[in-house]
Amino acid sequence: MPKTQYTKTALKEAIAGKLQRHFACEVEDATKDQVYEACALVVRDALTEHMIETQNEVEQDGERQVHYLCMEFLVGRSLRNNAYNLGMLDALTAALKDMGFEMADIFEEEADPGLGNGGLGRLAACYMDGMATDGVRGTGYSIRYEHGIFKQKIVEGQQVELPDSWLSTGEVWQIPAMDETREVKIGGTVDTYFDDNGKLVVNYHDYTPVLAVPYDMPISGYGTNNIARLRLWKAQSPIALDMKLFSSGEYLKALEKHALAETISMVLYPEDNHREGQSLRLKQQYFLVSATLQDICAKHKAKYGTLENFAHKHVLHINDTHPTLVIPELMRILMDENDMSWEQAWNITSQSVAYTNHTVMPEALECWPVSLVQELMPRVMQIIYEINERFCKELWNYFPNDFQKISKLAIVADDTVRMAHLAIAGSFSINGVSALHSEILKERVFTDFYKIYSSKFCNVTNGIAHRRWLCEANPELVELIESKIGTGYRTHPSELQVLNNYADDKELLDKLGEIKRHNKQRLADYIKAHNGIEVNMDSIFDVQVKRLHEYKRQMLNILHIISLYHKLKDNPDMDFVPRTFIFGSKAAPGYAVAKKTIQLINSISKMIDNDPAVRDKLKVVFLEDYKVSLAEIIMPAAEVSEQISIAGKEASGTGNMKFMMNGALTIGTMDGANVEICEAVGKENIFIFGMETPEAEALAASGSYEPMVIYQNDPVIRRVLDQMIHGFGDGVDYTDIANLLLHGGNGGPADRYMSLKDFASYAAAQERVSEVYRNQDQWNRMALINIANSGRFAADRSIAEYAQNIWRVKTNFAF
């Protein structure tokens, strides 16, 4: 545990002191937001002290450091998490109580940081927690997005995107390091020539300089003084305001250069369906990579006087393809700024970079137009050309005279730069994020690369920060668990397995059911307050919360809900286990089908809630602005976890793990980490349906799948789609959605992700869910078995595997 012991009295004094010094007010006059900031400052002081200790230890021991680059870190609120990890949560709660404040109210003052979007960013945040707790010398790097992804509002059933001004409460957790500001060069012209000694000289001029200003967020570990650091880069213009233009009234022109530079850190994932959006995204990626590498290299050189030992002291881990430019940028720094030969620079680079792939979707394996890369980073493009040239020569040794194969595997081809291919060529390790996903990478996505570089490929199944998602989010369940097995699982999550011994303990199972009901009530209260919908507490809380994408098949869930509505309308007195279907997701602003799907969910919700014949048995709720703090309410309350992507498309998933750890039962395909959840709990404790990966892939490849035949022969599906065409009583036409399922669109096949094909199997699995739910003893037993076997999905385990098998660094974690 932390060396420092925090007492109620000391914390009261510290908070009162912060209120006086920062707000010039006494406790009795302070507002909740002032008290929140005072608490945050007190906690941050402790974090800063530990961060300095950690940095001093890193300097002294000289061990290999991990640098984790990701475009997003969905960290969630910091106050409670840090107070919990530091061991001060109880004392802080008591201190605030004495001062007339409820801790829960103070927590609510903190906005969720807008630094991430979905699973990729949440995984990165969980891994920072794991690194800090496991004692891995790790630093995360990303961009300090001023407005984050976006704040979602639902207006007349439709998603509206608003700026997410999270910094008003999030800035307190960030420590600026102005003295470590770096300059990133965008655009310009490169002249190269060989001097009299045969050395390549690079002259880079007429570029646009952008300052990268670092802000550090300390990330606490549990029960340790070790701190991981998340360094966020803010873009600023170094060019002074043109006062002459400003004074003459040309205000916009005077500010133009400032604005162009600062847009880089304005918004996460700007739309890229136009050239300007593509340009901004690529600038963001290069800005992150260049600032980060300059930072690491400058500090390394200051300590060792050379970069020749760089690979022995650093691992650059790129989380998905977005930071892949780290490979040519490191080459640039080593050659152009440190006079290394190509061979020496490549040897260092290819021993320093590790790559995690997170997708098998072709459209997500990033490709950039050569012309755009050339325009924004001309020297980097030269280096990419050279990497490609040498790589293709290497490929020729494996596939002599097979020009088609080499073109297929090349880094640069068809006027595009293939980032995944660049990542594979320049990394010493390539890992998938579930056992199934890693096999798909080897057997289908990167088959030929695997034949050449089989030793590079490995698997590390994703994991979640179990202390946040169980210990903090579900305190009643934690109290029950710890009454039986103690607290060891907090740092050794595999100890949750001991709960298997209580699978037939009727008293414990009943208590588990009571706790679930309490958590359901909390979510029901939230739904009533935010959606105005009364939900049946005796209904099954069936939840699908995740990024909205066609492959995740929210549509399959919707089709089933409409079919249940029809059943109840036909037979209002049927024996029916009530259901509350809960959705939460954001659609990318330019993803029309996803946005229309959100509107469809809300149309169905309104129709059902206005129908007295069914509304006590069936409910549909869409929770707007899904984020970490909302997930912390949803996960403990969920009873059914919808993990229904078409098999072979979901790399892993982590929501499935959070639900499992909180006692929800999974209904899902054999996809991603669902496969490993099924192995962990046994097929009798999960509801599996649908095609498996080989069948789904074979059907797609054959071209023989005909959704129209299913529509014509299945009266249930026909009725569902016909209603979609005719509408749900609110005047909105969903013919376009039905046509996508039956006829295809946008160049894609009909029902691309085969929702109609898996519908019957899914509906049958949902019938099994209802039948088991009637027997609460059996249901609670299955829930306990899921909780007991969830420890293998802790981020601590994932980080330890990365440390041992990929990064080759020390860890405190014991398997």
Model-derived regions: residue spans:
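A conserved ligand/cofactor-binding region detector
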Residues: M1-F815
